[in-house]
Amino acid sequence: MHISALNSFLDFKKNYLTDKNSKIKIVEIGSQSINESIKNHLDKNHMYTGVDIVKGNNVDIVLDDPYKLPFEKDSIDVVISISTFEHTEFFWLSYLEILRILKPTGLFFLNAPSNSKYHRHSSDNWRFYPDSSKAL
């Protein structure tokens, strides 16, 4: 994980994950840890599940289908995706699945590069700009 992505997540956590008393269900999509993980920065009341399409550090569930998340509708408080959407062929299918599992008051933290160089990690399909977030 790039330091800028980690810092963005830490800002998100500081501003939005402020409840220290309630159990907060967090799902990270693309959770395989290469050099740093958000899991290391979560609080004791955060119930973390990491999902990815490959086995690895911080991967609790290996997905058979990257567009089907194994969670009930409206069951997750927070979904996090850091540097994953650019590698997802059909990111809009992932987005719809995220909306399905999020509680109505749930939060989605998306961090995706807009100006990084080509970096094929199975594939490199998209770049996201500020208007992308508004459109989603």
What residue spans do the PLM features occupy?
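Conserved SAM-binding loop
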Residues: 22-119, 131
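Short, solvent-exposed loop/turn segments at secondary-structure boundaries
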Residues: 120-124
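Short, well-ordered alpha-helical scaffold segments within catalytic/effector domains
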Residues: 6-10, 95, 130
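Class I SAM-dependent methyltransferase Rossmann-like catalytic core
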Residues: 1-19
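Hydrophobic helix-cap positions at the C-terminus of alpha-helices
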Residues: 16-19, 101, 136
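Short alpha-helix
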Residues: 125-136
